């Protein structure tokens, strides 16, 4: 009885394979719109606008023996982990984008998100959210996923041990906003 069923299944599979057209199917990855399963919240922070990517800051790289690959599709990226606070003096360092670091700006450093880009950062302890501009690389070697400027950290009410979620915001050339950072979110103007 088992042999008969096996034979029937094989024959059915062969017939199904022969009956269709000889067309190869390709899987195409189309970014899906951000899904919202709750109320929409208006958040403030950096003003997302289209900016040309910095060619030198967006190359895959290696640091301290570890390889970093720049995120090519931020629409399919989200990350959760601990935040660091970048507390340097104003104008004391240049960022990876070539700008002078300013702790009063709503900026952040991330090891692999495109520069410049924008992201919604959520403090998972208190639910606060802001938009930051990613303009630098880091943090490195301290198990942190993002380094926030002092202004960003203060707005989120974070410490160096606060768990956050990073959701990129994609800005198209016409200024339209999309991506994971726009789910249930509008950006205050």
List the predicted regions and their residue ranges.
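Sec-dependent bacterial lipoprotein signal peptides
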Residues: 1-18
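Secreted/periplasmic proteins
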Residues: 18-189
């Amino acid at each position: 009885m088992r042999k008969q069923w096996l034979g029937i299944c094989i024959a059915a599979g062969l017939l199904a394979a022969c009956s269709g057209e000889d067309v190869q199917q390709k899987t195409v990855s189309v970014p899906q719109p951000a899904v919202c399963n709750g109320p929409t919240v208006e958040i403030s922070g950096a003003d997302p606008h289209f900016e040309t990517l910095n060619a030198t800051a967006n190359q895959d790289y290696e640091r301290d023996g570890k390889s970093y690959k720049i995120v090519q599709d931020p629409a399919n990226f989200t990350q959760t982990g601990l935040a660091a606070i970048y507390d340097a003096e104003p104008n004391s360092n240049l960022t990876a984008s070539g700008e002078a670091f300013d702790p009063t700006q709503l900026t952040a450093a991330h090891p692999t998100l495109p520069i410049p880009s924008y992201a919604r950062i959520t403090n998972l302890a208190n639910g606060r959210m802001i938009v930051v501009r990613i303009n630098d690389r880091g943090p490195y070697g301290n198990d942190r996923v993002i380094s926030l400027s002092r202004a960003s950290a203060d707005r989120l009410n974070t410490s160096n041990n606060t768990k956050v979620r990073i959701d990129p915001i994609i800005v198209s050339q016409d200024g339209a906003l999309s991506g994971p950072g726009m789910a249930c979110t509008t950006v205050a103007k």
